């Protein structure tokens, strides 16, 4: 089913040999619903992979399986050459190396933006609070919201909250970042500011798996586009190739729907 | 009504002892109840079972029976609950330290019984925290314990505080049973003494005892109303 391009020779991405993320024969059921069907995927270091597909096709589940927020039923997932550990300390350590950005931001509501960003470094990485704070401020500057550091999440706009969430994930100095529809909960005028941050991350060589319907981002920042439908990876191609020339009917149909408005 | 004036010291002493009992039992109930709530949501199945069994037993047994087990069961098992003779604590709550164990038994019974209700109030507070909060905490690598401590519980407290207050008010009222299980000199035992031993008239004595309880429960109730009203305004 999966049509994969062997080497990755696209979009100015700098990618190297050994995959950082690797899924082999992954299956996942929700009760009778087979949401991931024999999924094989590898993501190289520095690679940016955009996942698109119709609602309910299993994109979020795929994304969440990678840091085991969603356990799988069969198959293997390896991250940085290690299979995902079972629930416990080792899994917590692995999760700290994989940043995750959610559709609904999920900033800690009772903590300021700065505290949101320093919690992980201080509690998980045992960094000195002062050092964590300095680094957090730099990250907040990088995403353009340093002046909001002392506010609570509810006091920020959606776009600012999502940028704070990205800073929180980056504070763990992750080896890869997972984004699950990071801009779909945003008002249109705020989408750009979040995509800009993501694009700059991609340029800096971050390994990223991004579930999104932002085709502009897919074209400009991705090395590969994966099209999912009904729990299967239907296509796996370079963005130019995919958008110009989708091979499957499902993908053609999907693209015609989202590109016409 | 002269009994209220003549024996003011008895009422005041009874109030003070009941107050101490309530402070200690409430502290114990909050600690045990939080622990049981954490067990009930823990990823380890046996801990969940223990937590559920605890709540099932203590929430569904009459307090009188729990008091009975503490006052007669513990001595039968050879325990005088000496672990509660905590140095330092006994200098503030002197009854904790004395040889007669019934005050300690009452603290234990009241705390264990109330803990089941505390657990359920906290659990409902935990359920009110959006699941995305815990998920984000897991995603940055916090362990189960850190997640609870830094992310989930601080937010759960907020929605649990009003139901918790109601639990504590119920506990204060329940503490009246202590005087019937060997505790000497609390509000209810003082009332018994005044009426049966000293032959004071029943109605004024019990009015005095009621005032003693109301002095504790009414301010707590007003405080809860305040908190609730402030929440309602903030939510608007
Ligand atoms: N916790 C769950 N329990 C049961 N079914 C679930 C659960 N989570 C997701 N599903 C189902 O699994 C399927 C795949 O869900 P998933 O969220 O991965 O899709 P998606 O591609 O991300 O969709 P969307 O674009 O709407 O976000 C859907 O049919 C969904 O209803
Ligand atoms: Mg989704």
Which positions does each model-derived feature cover?
Chain B
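Transmembrane alpha-helices and adjacent helix-loop boundaries
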Residues: 1-236
């Amino acid at each position: 089913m999966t049509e994969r391009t062997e080497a990755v020779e696209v979009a100015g991405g700098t990618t190297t040999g050994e995959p950082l993320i690797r899924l082999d024969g992954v299956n996942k059921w929700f009760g009778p619903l087979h949401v991931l069907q024999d999924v094989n995927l590898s993501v190289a270091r520095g690679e940016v992979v955009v996942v698109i597909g119709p609602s309910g096709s299993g994109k979020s589940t795929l994304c969440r399986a990678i840091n085991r927020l969603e356990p799988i039923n069969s198959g293997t997932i390896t991250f940085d050459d290690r299979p995902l550990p079972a629930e416990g300390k080792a899994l917590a350590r692995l999760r700290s190396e994989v940043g995750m950005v959610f559709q609904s931001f999920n900033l800690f509501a009772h903590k300021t933006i700065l505290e949101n960003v320093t919690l992980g470094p201080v509690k998980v990485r045992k960094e000195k609070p002062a050092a964590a704070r300095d680094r957090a401020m730099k990250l907040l500057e990088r995403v353009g919201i340093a002046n909001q550091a002392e506010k609570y999440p509810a006091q920020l706009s959606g776009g600012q909250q999502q940028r704070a969430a990205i800073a929180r994930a980056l504070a763990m100095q992750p080896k890869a970042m997972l984004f699950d529809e990071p801009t779909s909960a945003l008002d249109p005028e705020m989408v750009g500011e979040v995509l800009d941050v993501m694009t700059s991350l991609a340029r800096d060589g971050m390994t990223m798996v991004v579930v999104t319907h932002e085709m502009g981002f897919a074209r400009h920042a991705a090395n590969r586009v994966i099209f999912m439908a009904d729990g299967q990876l239907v296509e796996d191609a370079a963005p130019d190739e995919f958008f110009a020339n989708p091979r499957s009917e499902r993908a053609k149909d999907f693209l015609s729907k989202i590109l016409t408005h | 009504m002269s009994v209220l004036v003549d024996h003011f010291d008895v009422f005041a002493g009874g109030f003070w002892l009941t107050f101490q009992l309530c402070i200690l039992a409430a502290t114990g109930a909050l600690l045990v109840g939080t622990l049981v709530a954490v067990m009930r949501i823990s990823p380890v199945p046996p801990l969940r079972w223990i937590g559920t069994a605890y709540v099932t037993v203590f929430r569904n047994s009459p307090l009188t029976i729990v008091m009975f087990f503490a006052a007669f069961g513990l001595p039968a098992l050879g325990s005088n609950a000496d672990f509660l003779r905590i140095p330092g604590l006994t200098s503030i709550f002197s009854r904790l330290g004395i040889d007669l164990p019934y005050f300690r038994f009452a603290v234990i019974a009241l705390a264990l019984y109330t803990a089941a209700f505390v657990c359920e109030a906290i659990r409902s507070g935990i359920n009110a925290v959006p699941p995305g909060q815990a998920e984000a905490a897991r995603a940055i690598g916090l362990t189960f314990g850190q997640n609870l401590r830094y992310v989930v519980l601080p937010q759960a407290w907020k929605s649990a505080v009003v139901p918790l207050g109601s639990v504590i008010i119920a506990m204060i009222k329940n503490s009246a049973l202590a005087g019937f299980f060997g505790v000497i000199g609390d509000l209810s035992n003082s009332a018994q003494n005044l009426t049966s031993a000293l032959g004071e008239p029943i109605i004024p004595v019990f009015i005095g005892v009621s005032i003693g309880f109301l002095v504790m429960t009414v301010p707590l109730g007003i405080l809860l109303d305040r908190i609730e009203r402030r929440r309602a305004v903030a939510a608007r």
